[in-house]
């Protein structure tokens, strides 16, 4: 049937901020869904609190509510926008949970759910209802029991036995789940799982550890047509969350008989659950010996795996699911890549490998052991002609300095221990075991990874050990290595290792070129080349191909520009950079220039098949970039939008005289080189904090003594503030140097950067655009947290509350830097205002993570403006094209936007609740995974909204726990007095209690954990604490860390700096005032 005409206003619920388990994949699916609904003529209304997403750009929906995703807000939008139907299946667990809460409160009267009805959501998400539905249709399930209390859980474990898996209903990314091997572990896991489930329901089931795990991406329409889009196999056996597992498509160790059983079961499950207009993900486990197949769970929505399946096959699951939700059937929908009906099941003639990206180095105390609760921050995908080619390409894509199967250890006992323990480096330890002569069967007993995968790694190791310089003149051998996925850099490294002969990657490339060994570029076309592909979505392979290679036909010379993406999501480089790359592609379209996108992240909008004119899915390594440049003969390359990843390639690109457009490499080099940049600032007479570069440990002590404490130290060439610390005295410096030199050598090549730390300074971020002649100061973002907390973790807002004199100076200095550097495009400058003086902290001649937020706040697409400037080098023209009404200031070559009449605030979102053992205290090393935006008529209300959106709601009354470090106590007492005046009660441990008492602020003294019972943890567990204020630091004792862990565990809202408390007080003082719920389009009128 054609599209429905009985509905017109459709509300799409987004997934909110990037968190572990819900990342860019929902921006990809949401953007695709918004575009589809709009193209079909529906009025689209969106709610999503994440400003870094493409889907929240005003042009993708008619009304865009960047507001907290709460039942109350959704109900207000339903009434205000006269919503006919809600599409909740594109917003992950957040959207499903929101509509379930609304249903339970009776808030969905007269509104239809599209894609999945309430009954289907309940059956799919409620583990008891799912079990009953599966038993009804004869599906085998793991033996299990449900529990709603800790007592029922204990009864269940007596029946199930150990080891047992505990799973919580209606949670994201395995939240609250785990494997218990004994009663003590079980009791803690059961309590946590009951707390994590919004309906206090948990499932205790028999352990399936060691079983093989598979996922089926299924689509069903209203005519009961069903297709399997993709079958994904987990290399890691059951026991590791599928989001943390290395996965492959198509499945490689599944017999056709098993596949058909799984396919039939998937269709039967969708029919029983009631998913009749959309996509779902169904997970199975198969015993490797008995072949018993059990159903694990299903998601009645588009999921993380759906995004992977879409990118792996080229089949646009989110678009098709959206069209099915509004009435179409599969045979009525056209596959955009081949122009064949969407009812054709995709067929793959290549192998896809996904590897997760972790950030354990950022969180001391967090175990890197993987289990049923997800821990990864991002992922990469690689495509190859065979398994090993795809696997090695994926390893190279992770950007953690692995060139392939790097050797990690020669200690066999240590290696065996690491193979037993699921962890991000397990495959590399398996390779090390094979290097030491361990057989496949012995490795299998340690890890339960299928023997076929293990034998492939063993084969790779055998080949590696035979690599020597003779391959450089032997075409057959060299082609064979490239066919197995060996990068030029890895071949060079193995020649050095095996022969002690220095060979550079360039020499390997030259040898390849002389022997005419170049990659073939093949298409992802959903049909194994059976039909002609109309949209170029390409990957490289050295695998032999019986078909002729795809030619890069160019009827006439069209201008083309290559955009180098940002690679895997990680802390410090997230969705904000992908947003900028997407905008670059859209801006090139406006210029009638062909865009070529290059990335390896399957979650993102940039790797959607219709974002750019040509898409290359490849590791972001110089070897791959060079081959694409040579193939495409591009007229320009953009390296400034993907964060540090493409910027690191700029030097090699400049050497080969590649056409980098925008800010040239020599400018990037000045900004990135500490000594060159300090000289540059001296020439311009711009103040920066006292600093020095220590090239040895002794030099570090002498520089610190000259500068004076406190100091901030950081090694060179690290991302996201890794190993960066604030040190108060010589003893702390000594301890730091002793610990950091274990991880990093301080030398002339790797100096330690030492700066004077400006205490109590106000930090600012400035984003600007320059064309070498004029400058556009897009925004001055004021940080709430003081200097010393990484800018990516600090809340910031616009317009600034600083004096006009300081703001004028910031604009003047920013313009001076941009023009004298010779920036063409975006740049980001960080300043600190200390004792009324302006200091420059750093300059990044690239897009920053604040660009998407600022673009939303101003209504100006900054990345598009910058792209146009990079191509045309005409700032005035670019602003006129994209910002017809907003420029108000022009003086001395400086443009300024009209400041908003509202306050827009960006707040960071952290993964602490997913990473057990992490500490919520912030510092110079970045820890946040995502962000939210609060928009309101005042700073206090914007902050109030942002805290609600980032799961840290501000309470209006109750008991506040206060723990203040000594140096903050005097200032804190003044603020605490205001909290008491607002009606709050305070409680504190002895030191803070005495300080409050001395200042005349009433508080209840509570015991520390080590002082007896009942203590502060008991109060938290009993739900008596409404909020916590803790300004301790990482140097505080274990007792304080346990208290902070209790804050997280018991979902207590918390605040960790005095500057945040000042804004919290504003929020509390204004929270009783009504603030109308407005769409972004209304704010920008």
From Swiss-Prot:
Residues 131-326, 678-871 form the ATP-grasp domain. Transmembrane segments: none annotated. Pathway: Amino-acid biosynthesis; L-arginine biosynthesis; carbamoyl phosphate from bicarbonate: step 1/1; Pyrimidine metabolism; UMP biosynthesis via de novo pathway; (S)-dihydroorotate from bicarbonate: step 1/3. It catalyses: hydrogencarbonate + L-glutamine + 2 ATP + H2O = carbamoyl phosphate + L-glutamate + 2 ADP + phosphate + 2 H(+). Mn(2+) 2 binds at residues 297, 299. CDD domains: MGS_CPS_II. Residues 1-399 are annotated as: Carboxyphosphate synthetic domain. Mg(2+) 1 binds at residues 283, 297. Mn(2+) 3 binds at residues 830, 842. Residues 952-1085 form the MGS-like domain. GO terms for cellular component: cytoplasm. Binds 4 Mg(2+) or Mn(2+) ions per subunit. Residues 553-951 are annotated as: Carbamoyl phosphate synthetic domain. Gene3D superfamilies: 3.40.50.20, ATP-grasp fold, A domain (3.30.1490.20), ATP-grasp fold, B domain (3.30.470.20), Carbamoyl-phosphate synthetase, large subunit oligomerisation domain (1.10.1030.10), Methylglyoxal synthase-like domain (3.40.50.1380). Residues 400-552 are annotated as: Oligomerization domain. Mg(2+) 3 binds at residues 830, 842. Mn(2+) 1 binds at residues 283, 297. Its EC number is 6.3.4.16, 6.3.5.5. Large subunit of the glutamine-dependent carbamoyl phosphate synthetase (CPSase). CPSase catalyzes the formation of carbamoyl phosphate from the ammonia moiety of glutamine, carbonate, and phosphate donated by ATP, constituting the first step of 2 biosynthetic pathways, one leading to arginine and/or urea and the other to pyrimidine nucleotides. Belongs to the CarB family. The large subunit is composed of 2 ATP-grasp domains that are involved in binding the 2 ATP molecules needed for carbamoyl phosphate synthesis. The N-terminal ATP-grasp domain (referred to as the carboxyphosphate synthetic component) catalyzes the ATP-dependent phosphorylation of hydrogencarbonate to carboxyphosphate and the subsequent nucleophilic attack by ammonia to form a carbamate intermediate. This is Carbamoyl phosphate synthase large chain. It comes from Helicobacter pylori (strain ATCC 700392 / 26695). The gene is carB.
């Amino acid at each position: 049937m054609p599209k429905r005409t009985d509905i017109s206003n459709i509300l799409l619920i987004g997934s909110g901020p990037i968190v572990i388990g819900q990342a860019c994949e929902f921006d990809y699916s949401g953007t695709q869904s918004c575009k589809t609904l709009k193209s079909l003529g529906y009025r689209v209304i969106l709610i999503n609190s994440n400003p870094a997403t493409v889907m929240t750009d005003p042009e993708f929906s008619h009304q865009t509510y960047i507001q907290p995703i709460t039942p109350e807000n959704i109900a207000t939008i339903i009434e205000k926008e006269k919503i006919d139907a809600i599409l909740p299946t594109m917003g992950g667990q957040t959207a499903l949970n929101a509509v379930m809460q609304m249903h339970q409160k009776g808030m969905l009267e007269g509104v239809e759910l599209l894609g999945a009805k309430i009954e289907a959501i309940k059956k799919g998400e409620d583990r008891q209802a799912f079990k009953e539905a599966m038993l009804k249709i004869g599906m085998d399930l793991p033996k299990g029991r449900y529990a709603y209390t800790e007592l029922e859980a204990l009864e269940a474990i007596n029946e199930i036995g150990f080891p047992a898996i505990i799973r919580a209903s209606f949670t994201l990314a395995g939240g609250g789940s785990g494997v218990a091997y004994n009663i003590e572990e079980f009791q803690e896991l059961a309590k946590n799982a009951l707390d994590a489930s919004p309906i206090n329901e948990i499932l205790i089931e028999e352990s399936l550890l060691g079983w093989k795990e598979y996922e089926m991406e299924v689509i069903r329409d209203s005519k009961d047509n069903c297709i399997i889009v993709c079958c994904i196999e987990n290399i890691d056996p059951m026991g590791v969350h599928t989001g943390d597992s290395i996965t492959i498509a198509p499945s490689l160790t599944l017999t056709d008989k098993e596949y058909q059983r799984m396919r039939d079961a998937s269709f039967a499950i969708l029919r029983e659950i009631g998913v009749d207009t959309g996509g779902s993900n169904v997970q199975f486990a198969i015993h490797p010996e008995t072949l018993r197949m059990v159903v694990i769970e299903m998601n009645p929505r588009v999921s993380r795996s759906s995004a992977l399946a879409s990118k792996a096959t080229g089949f646009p699951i989110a678009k098709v699911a959206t069209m099915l939700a509004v009435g179409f059937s599969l045979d009525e929908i056209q596959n955009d890549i081949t122009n064949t009906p969407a009812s054709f099941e995709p067929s793959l003639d290549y192998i896809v490998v996904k590897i997760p990206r972790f950030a354990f180095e950022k969180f001391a105390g967090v175990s890197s052991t993987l289990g049923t609760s997800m821990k990864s921050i991002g992922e990469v995908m690689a495509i190859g002609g065979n398994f090993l080619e795809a696997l090695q390409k994926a390893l190279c894509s992770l950007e953690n300095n692995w060139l392939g199967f790097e050797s990690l250890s020669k200690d066999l006992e240590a290696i065996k221990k690491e193979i037993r323990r699921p962890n991000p480096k397990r495959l590399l330890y398996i390779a090390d075991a094979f290097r030491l002569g361990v057989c496949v069967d012995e490795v299998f007993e340690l890890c339960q990874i299928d023997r076929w995968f293990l034998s492939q790694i063993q084969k790779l190791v055998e080949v590696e050990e035979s690599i020597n310089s003779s391959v450089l003149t032997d075409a057959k051998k060299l082609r064979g290595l490239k066919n197995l996925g060996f990068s030029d850099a890895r071949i060079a490294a193995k020649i050095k290792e095996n022969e002690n002969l220095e060979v550079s990657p360039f020499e390997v490339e030259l040898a390849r070129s002389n022997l005419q060994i170049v990659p073939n570029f093949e298409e992802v076309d959903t049909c194994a080349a059976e039909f002609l592909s109309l949209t170029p979505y390409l990957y490289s392979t050295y695998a032999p191909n019986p078909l002729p290679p795809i030619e890069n036909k160019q009827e006439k010379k069209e201008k083309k520009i290559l955009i180098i993406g940002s690679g895997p999501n990680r802390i410090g480089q997230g969705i904000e950079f992908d947003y900028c790359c997407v905008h670059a592609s859209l801006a090139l379209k406006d210029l009638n220039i062909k865009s070529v996108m290059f990335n390896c992240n399957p979650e993102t909008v940039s790797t959607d098949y219709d974002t750019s004119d040509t898409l290359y899915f490849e590791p972001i390594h110089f070897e791959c970039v060079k081959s694409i440049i040579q193939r495409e003969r591009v007229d320009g390359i953009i390296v400034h939008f993907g964060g540090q990843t493409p910027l690191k390639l700029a030097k090699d690109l400049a050497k080969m005289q590649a056409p980098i457009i925008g800010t040239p490499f020599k400018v990037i080099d000045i900004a990135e080189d500490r000594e060159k940049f300090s000289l540059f600032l001296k020439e311009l007479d711009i103040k920066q904090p006292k600093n020095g570069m220590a090239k040895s440990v002794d030099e570090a002590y002498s520089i610190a003594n000259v500068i004076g404490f406190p100091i901030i130290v950081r090694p060179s060439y690290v991302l996201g503030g890794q190993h960066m610390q604030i040190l108060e005295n010589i003893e702390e410096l000594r301890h730091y140097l002793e610990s950091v030199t274990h991880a990093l050598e301080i030398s002339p090549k790797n100096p330690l950067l030492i700066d004077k730390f400006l205490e109590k300074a106000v930090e600012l971020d400035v984003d600007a655009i320059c064309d070498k002649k004029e400058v556009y100061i897009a925004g001055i973002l004021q940080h709430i947290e003081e200097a010393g907390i990484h800018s990516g973790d600090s809340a910031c807002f616009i317009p600034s509350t600083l004096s006009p004199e300081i703001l004028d100076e910031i604009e003047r200095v920013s313009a001076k830097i941009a023009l004298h550097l010779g920036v063409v495009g975006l740049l980001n400058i960080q300043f600190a205002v200390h004792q009324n003086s302006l200091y420059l902290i750093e300059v990044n001649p690239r897009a920053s993570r604040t660009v998407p937020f600022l673009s939303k706040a101003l209504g100006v697409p900054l990345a598009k403006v910058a792209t146009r400037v990079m191509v045309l080098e005409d700032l005035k023209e670019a602003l006129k094209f994209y910002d017809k009404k907003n420029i108000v200031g022009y003086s001395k070559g400086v443009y300024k936007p009209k400041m908003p009449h509202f306050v827009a605030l960006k707040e960071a979102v952290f993964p602490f609740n997913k990473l057990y053992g992490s500490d919520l205290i912030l510092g110079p090393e970045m820890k946040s995974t995502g962000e939210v935006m609060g928009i309101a008529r005042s700073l206090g209300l914007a902050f109030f909204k942002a805290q609600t959106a980032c799961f840290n709601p501000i309470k209006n009354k109750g008991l506040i726990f206060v723990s203040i470090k000594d140096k903050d106590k005097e200032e804190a007492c003044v603020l605490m007095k205001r909290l008491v005046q607002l009606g709050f009660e305070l409680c504190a441990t002895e030191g803070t209690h005495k300080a409050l008492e001395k200042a005349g602020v009433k508080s209840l003294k509570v015991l520390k954990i080590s002082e007896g019972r009942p203590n502060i943890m008991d109060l938290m567990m009993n739900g008596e604490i409404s909020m916590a204020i803790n300004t301790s630091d990482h140097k505080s004792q274990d007792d304080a860390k346990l208290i902070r862990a209790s804050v997280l565990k018991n979902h207590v809202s918390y605040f960790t700096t005095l500057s945040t408390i000042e804004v919290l007080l504003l929020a509390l003082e204004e929270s009783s005032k009504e603030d109308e719920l407005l769409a972004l389009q209304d704010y920008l009128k």
